[in-house]
Amino acid sequence: MDIRNIVILTGAGVSAESGLATFRGPDGLWEGHRVEDVCTPEAYRRDPALVHAFYDARREKLGTVQPNAAHEALARLDAEWPGELLLVTQNVDDLHERAGSKRLLHMHGELTKGWCVACGKKFEWTGPMSPNSVFPEPVEGPSFSSAAKEQGSPSTSSGRTEVNVCPGCHAVGRVRPDIVWFGEMPYEMERIDEALRACDLFVSIGTSGAVYPAAGFVQTARYCGAHCIEINLEPSLGSYLFNESRVGKAGELVPAWVDEVLGQSAHSSPISR
């Protein structure tokens, strides 16, 4: 059967090869923190300063790394694949975008966006977000969108400008990272489910197979008849659900797989199941 419709899921293993820490290390911690202390709504209510500091550090780190060969290969597939394609990432970094991917969906949100809990507005945000972070006036640099700079931001008594200000409603200290935390619903689940049920080929890259609902994507795709491939540094918890498994570094295996898929497409040959 010809492959016309592809869904790809990427996880932390893809960005790890660019130098970003995986979601959980061998000790169960994420950059030295328990997940429940920095990645839940309860943690944010309990200690917003800690949560903001954690994501400010992740955002700063993101600015020091570059897309790797896996990101670049997937962007090439996006550009050259003639059929339907949806790249769903669990990662909150922007490395897929920087590599050039367009048909992309961030199911767990984006580190480079803010979300105002006062008005619901979302916007680009690449600098510090902590309410304790302030810059001398006038505001310069990447922390504000152009709209925020034009509208102005409240100043402290010392004449410095608050960083955590919504560019829409101007609420101070109400902007949180646009990240889906544990206990919150991932984005675009209806669209993802529709794509999984319609795809001919599902490929999971660099995921642990431990975090739902993404861990269940292979079951949906395979039940609906898709050929399923896992590309991972080691077999995931759900590797037995895939038709085939390719073990190794994403930066090596993904470019080879993309060459394979595009080569078969160029010759109008079916990708066998």
Across the structure, where does each feature detected by a protein language model lie?
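Conserved catalytic core of sirtuin-type NAD+-dependent deacylases
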Residues: 1-273
